[in-house]
Amino acid sequence: MKLLLSNDDGIFSPGIRTLADTLAAAGHEVMVVCPDRERSATGHGLTLFDPIRAEAVASLFHPSVKAWACSGTPSDCIKLALGALLDSLPDFVLSGINQGSNLGTDILYSGTVSAAMEGVIEGIPSMALSLTSFTVREFQPAANFARDLLAKLDHTPLPEAMLLNINVPALPAAEIAGVAITRQGIRRYHDMFKKRVDPRGKTYYWLAGEVLEDVNDPEQGVDSEMLTDVQAIRENLITITPLKYNLTHTPGLQTLSTWLNLPLLLQTDP
C-alpha cells in the first residue's frame, strides 16, 4: 500500500520513526511529511498568512522512506503532501504514533487526529495512533498493531472513508488485554493558568491543569453498553474509535424544528 504519514510531535519524534520504519520493512511505500518542530494541541489549524516550506530529510528513516520536514501545522502537512509533494494519492493516511493519549474530547484539540482527519476530508481512509503515556517511549507494540491492522484492511477495505482513532496502552505487548471497538468518551480537565512575570517585568500565563474522571454521557443512537475509549484504556485494551468530520448534532435538528418558530423569527417590526 502507498501510505502517507504525519504527526504533531515533529519530524524527530521516535513515534513516527518507529511507525515509518515498521511499515516500510513490511513492504509498504511510505512517505512522511511532518512538522519541523513540536506542534501538539494545534487542532485543525492551517497556515494562511505565512509561507509554508518543506525540506527533504535524509537518514532519519528506513532507506526506502521519502520524508519532508514542513514548517506548517499537522493539517498543513497533509494538505501540502496531497496537493504538491506526492505524485499520486495514498491508499491510507496515518498520523502518529503520538506521545500521549488522544481520548474523548482530547480529539478536538489534537494535531494528531486533525492530520488524519484531513485525509478523510479528501476521501482517504485514515488512522490516528497514540501511545497512552507521556514518558514511556516503547512505540513498537503500537507500530506492530498498525502494521497488522493495515494488512487486514488491505484484504477487507473499509466500506467508506473514515478515521480510526487508535489508542494503545503503554504496556509490553504481552500485557495488553485485547482490542475493543469503542465510542468516543468525554474527558474533562481542571484548567489552571499559572501567572508569571518575565525578565522584563511583563505578566504572562502558562496553561496547566489535571485530568478529571470521564463523564458518562451516552450518545443518542449509540449502544450505551459499548465501552468508551476512556473506559477501555483503563482495562488495558487497545481502542479503535471510528470518527467523522460532520459535527451536526442530529437530534438537535428535530429539537430546533419543533422549538423555533422560524416564521415568527423572520417577522420585523412595522
From Swiss-Prot:
Swiss-Prot/TrEMBL cofactor(s): a divalent metal cation
Cellular location of this protein? Cytoplasm
Q: What Gene3D superfamilies does its record include?
A: Survival protein SurE-like phosphatase/nucleotidase
> What sort of enzyme, by top EC class, is this?
hydrolase
Q: What is its EC number?
A: 3.1.3.5
Q: Which reaction does it catalyse?
A: a ribonucleoside 5'-phosphate + H2O = a ribonucleoside + phosphate
Manner of cofactor binding, per the entry note: Binds 1 divalent metal cation per subunit.
Q: Output the InterPro entries linked to this UniProt entry.
A: SurE, SurE-like_Pase/nucleotidase, SurE-like_sf
Where does this protein hold a divalent metal cation? D8, D9, S40, N98
Q: Which domain of life is it from?
A: Bacteria
The record's section on SUPFAM superfamilies has:
SurE-like
Q: Does the keyword Cytoplasm apply?
A: yes
Spell out the GO cellular component terms annotated for this protein, sorted alphabetically and separated by semicolons: cytoplasm
Sorted alphabetically, the keyword list is:
Cytoplasm, Hydrolase, Metal-binding, Nucleotide-binding
Q: Cite the GO molecular-function annotations of the record.
A: 3'-nucleotidase activity; 5'-nucleotidase activity; exopolyphosphatase activity; metal ion binding; nucleotide binding
Q: Which PANTHER family match?
A: 5'-NUCLEOTIDASE SURE (PTHR30457), 5'_3'-NUCLEOTIDASE SURE (PTHR30457:SF12)
Q: Which family does it belong to?
A: Belongs to the SurE nucleotidase family.
Protein function: Nucleotidase that shows phosphatase activity on nucleoside 5'-monophosphates.
The molecule here is called 5'-nucleotidase SurE
